[in-house]
C-alpha cells in the first residue's frame, strides 16, 4: 500500500504539504487505523518531518487514538472534527468534478444516416 506523493486530487489541488499528506493518507484509508510508524513508512516521510507536523494534528483534534496494540498506539482521523469534515467535503467535490470532466470526454453525438 505504498503512497505516492501528488497522486491524489486533494494534493494536486492544495499542494503536497506534510500536514496535507498525512491527512490525505487517512482520507484515502477511512476504515483503517494506523500507528505512527506505519504512517511514516507508507508516506515515505522523514521521521523528523512527520513528528514536527503530527503534534499540530493531535493538538487540533484532527486525529484521535482508536486503540493500543502492545506498545503501538493506533490513530485515525476524527470525522467529527469541523476541519476534517470540510476536508472530506472538498475531497468529494474534487472527485465529483474529476468524474464529470472524464465523462465529458466520452460523450459523443450520435449521427443517424438517413436512407
Segments and roles (model prediction):
Residues 54-56:
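Short, hydrophobic-biased segments on the C-terminal half of alpha helices
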Residues 13, 27-31:
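Short helix-capping/hinge SLiMs at alpha-helix to coil transitions
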Residues 58-68:
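A short, conserved structural fragment
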Residues 9-19, 35, 66-90:
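Short, cationic-aromatic polyanion-contact patches
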Residues 46-49:
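Short coil turns linking two alpha-helices in DNA-binding domains
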Residues 82-115:
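Amphipathic alpha-helical dimerization/coiled-coil segments
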Residues 20-25:
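Pre-recognition alpha-helix immediately N-terminal to the DNA-recognition helix
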Residues 38-42:
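A short acidic, leucine-rich amphipathic alpha-helix
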Amino acid at each position: 500500500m505504498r503512497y505516492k506523493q501528488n497522486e491524489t486530487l486533494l494534493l494536486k489541488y492544495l499542494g503536497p504539504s506534510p500536514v496535507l499528506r498525512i491527512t490525505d493518507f487517512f482520507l484515502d484509508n477511512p476504515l483503517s487505523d494506523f500507528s505512527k510508524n506505519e504512517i511514516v513508512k507508507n508516506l515515505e516521510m522523514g521521521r523528523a518531518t512527520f513528528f514536527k507536523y503530527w503534534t499540530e494534528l493531535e493538538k487540533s483534534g484532527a486525529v484521535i487514538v482508536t486503540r493500543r496494540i502492545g506498545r503501538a498506539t493506533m490513530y485515525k482521523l476524527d470525522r467529527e472534527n469541523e476541519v476534517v469534515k470540510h476536508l472530506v467535503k472538498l475531497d468529494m467535490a474534487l472527485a465529483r468534478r474529476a468524474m464529470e470532466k472524464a465523462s465529458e470526454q466520452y460523450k459523443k453525438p450520435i449521427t443517424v444516416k438517413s436512407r
